[in-house]
């Protein structure tokens, strides 16, 4: 099995073929869900176009259908502005959230240029990795 980590896909350059693959979309947070909705929609469209270009009808050859799953670190408990298909969202094998969290702003260390400031803000918000429970702070 080969794992490809990709942010923006240039199909020509990377020779990436989505047809018949299992694709996992990964994001830090399911906030408004608009990013996940957009990413899924675009990848589904790309997979369909690639299958058509190869003359593959996935309704007749179901094993060539591209399967999508989604993993997020944090699923914010709030109304979403966009939807995901029930076949993904309601399937525990296709939608994974490491943790459901309140609707707060979460700062991730890979987005910070100043780790000291980031850590201070994380502690202030009750999101320090050394504490299991916000009440311990």
Regions found by a protein language model. Name each.
Residues 1-25, 31-41:
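Short, glycine/charge-rich flexible loops or terminal/linker lids adjacent to PRPP-binding catalytic cores
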Residues 30-31, 77:
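A short acidic, glycine/proline-enriched capping/turn motif at secondary-structure boundaries
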